[in-house]
Regions:
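A cytosolic small-molecule/anion-sensing beta-strand core signal
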Residues: 1-2
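ATP-binding/phosphotransfer module of carbohydrate and carboxylate kinases, centering on a glycine-rich
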Residues: 5, 20-28, 32-147
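Short, intrinsically disordered, charge-biased short linear motifs at domain edges
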Residues: 12-21
Length: 147
């Protein structure tokens, strides 16, 4: 905020992956249920793919093909809901995706529309961009901001 890293009173600000997306949802390693991370992280998406198709595949392999319709619809719904909550609370200038999920190309068009369908405002202009530093961009950014 105002050019400084906001850590929050107890240093947990920004833990979007542990925001509750689905109450009584999937169990998370943090001990809670329904965390964003249990639905839209690479491992969670691969696990759901296995449940729907019976096939073990990487997120990269899944998205190189035409994904299972139910898998893709669930992914977009969860992505839209989760990110709309962040946008409604913070109203950021831009959202930059990091990690393996940032390599899912349809998130930058279909994902953006899924967010727009769920965000409070009728005029959403917050762009969703791919990071320029690879899967570990968030780690690099956090290091830079913490100095």
């Amino acid at each position: 905020i105002n050019g400084t890293l906001h850590k929050g009173r107890t240093n947990i600000a920004g833990e979007w992956g542990h925001h509750t997306l689905r109450p009584d949802g999937n169990e998370c390693y943090c001990g809670k249920q329904g965390c964003v991370e249990t639905y839209i992280s690479g491992p969670a998406l691969e696990k759901r793919w296995l449940e729907l198709t019976g096939r073990i595949e990487s997120l990269q392999a899944i998205t190189k093909q035409t994904p299972n319709k139910q898998w893709k619809m669930e992914f977009l719904d969860n992505f839209g809901t989760g990110l709309a909550n962040v946008i409604d609370i913070l109203d950021p200038d831009v959202v930059v995706l990091g990690g393996g999920v940032s390599n899912v190309s349809f998130l930058y068009d279909e994902g953006w529309h899924a967010v727009c369908d769920k965000v409070f405002s009728d005029s959403v202009e917050t762009p969703i961009l791919k990071n320029k530093l690879g899967d570990s961009a968030g780690v690099f950014g956090a290091c830079l901001l913490s100095n």
